[in-house]
Amino acid sequence: MSAIIEAKKQLVDEIAEVLSNSVSTVIVDYRGLTVAEVTDLRSQLREAGVEYKVYKNTMVRRAAEKAGIEGLDEFLTGPTAIATSSEDAVAAAKVISGFAKDHEALEIKSGVMEGNVITAEEVKTVGSLPSHDGLVSMLLSVLQAPVRNFAYAVKAIGEQKEESAE
């Protein structure tokens, strides 16, 4: 019996470490999905660099407590799978939200962003945001626009002066 308890403690430590190291976590109820659909979801998540695992609710509850995450208890009922991303804060929410639109059986329960519990609606909102790279490119284009417009204005003035000099 002691070996079983040690294995459970080790699993709780592993889950707590995953929760602590992830920048975003999405908790879903996968009930009603076929094996093919779950396999498809797993492959999409893997491509996005997101880890997807099914854990017992009691183990997740203890791990969340150990990781200092409060407020998850109410969402840990029924079959629960957890998608975590340690790199991109938007990746897990984006893939899960997109998959949930096409497959109504996948229910988003809640999520955790940087240690704070968020609702299913907030997960969907985060999922609709562009990725980090997309946001950076948007910012760069906004910063580049005034310089580009100034260059066009200088070029137009130069062309205008050339025409008047002729």
UniProtKB/Swiss-Prot annotation:
Q: What is this protein called?
A: Large ribosomal subunit protein uL10
Family assignment from sequence similarity: Belongs to the universal ribosomal protein uL10 family.
Gene Ontology terms: cellular component: large ribosomal subunit
Per UniProt, which keywords does this protein have?
Answer: Ribonucleoprotein, Ribosomal protein, RNA-binding, rRNA-binding
Task: Output one GO MF annotation.
Answer: structural constituent of ribosome
Q: Which Gene3D superfamilies match?
A: 3.30.70.1730, 6.10.250.290
Recorded name of the encoding gene = rplJ
The answer to whether the entry has keyword Methyltransferase is no
Query: Which InterPro entries does the entry mention?
Result: Ribosomal_uL10 (IPR001790), Ribosomal_uL10-like_sf (IPR043141), Ribosomal_uL10_bac (IPR022973), Ribosomal_uL10_bac_type (IPR047865), Ribosomal_uL10_CS_bac (IPR002363)
Q: List the disulfide bonds.
A: none
Superkingdom, according to UniProt? Answer: Bacteria
Q: Which GO terms describe its biological process?
A: translation
Q: What exactly does this protein do?
A: Forms part of the ribosomal stalk, playing a central role in the interaction of the ribosome with GTP-bound translation factors.
- Assembly and oligomerization: Part of the ribosomal stalk of the 50S ribosomal subunit. The N-terminus interacts with L11 and the large rRNA to form the base of the stalk. The C-terminus forms an elongated spine to which L12 dimers bind in a sequential fashion forming a multimeric L10(L12)X complex.
